[in-house]
């Protein structure tokens, strides 16, 4: 029986599938798998199930001389050297569609949380309390009727747009390609990045990360935004220059931010933790029972397909 190495615990539905077709070795230690353990694990393995937090670099790929597939448990894949994997004729797959609804739900949840100061209000209610209802007390911003600017109208961005339309929001989007069919379906308008930054009341980042996207949102971009804008990032941390974001918040150049991802993840900049107009969540975009179960089935089936000589779904290289 061929071996699969699983770089961390995954839901049982996927693990059982793997156990039916492979000798399964899984990292069960505390925290993230370290490089030496990963290199040891991929030796003699035909398939690797990697997590978003698993750094699969050239050294790891070279150690996995028998690898046919690296099935990444997540929609993103910037944790893997996909070009080098291609050179080695190793398929790399991801789990794109499984994350769509969960991540879109969280994105809109972050919009509401930061605009209506929900987390801040929860903390107040649990600590000092409040003196009762008052006309000027704890005001936030309404979402309905505002303009949302979506960076990246892929599967997740489109799902965010549909939810935003249910709030009677006007939808702007930007990306490398115009998507006229989706524009008609959703009621979205394509604009360039600068126009989106200048006109949106809420900016959500839902684009996939690649090196060209690094620090797409930096000091110059913050200066283009409305002073009342909220920035929401549920994609990848390095798309936003985190120190520039901190400065924009401190200088009141923008009204608030809600982040599920971080530039130096899992580390979170201390300044972000100290600001009341920032909502922080621990990279839980697709952290639902439904999504995570589906993701585990997708990676398991991809690995099974690869060892059976079939082309797996969702190859990214």
From Swiss-Prot:
It comes from the Bacteria. GO terms for molecular function: NAD binding; oxidoreductase activity, acting on the CH-OH group of donors, NAD or NADP as acceptor. Its EC number is 1.1.1.-. It is an enzyme of class 1 (oxidoreductase). CDD domains: 2-Hacid_dh_13 (cd12178). The keyword NAD applies. Keywords: NAD, Oxidoreductase. InterPro entries: D-2-hydroxyacid_DH, D-isomer_2_OHA_DH_cat_dom, D-isomer_DH_NAD-bd, NAD(P)-bd_dom_sf. Pfam families: 2-Hacid_dh, 2-Hacid_dh_C. This is Putative 2-hydroxyacid dehydrogenase SA2098.
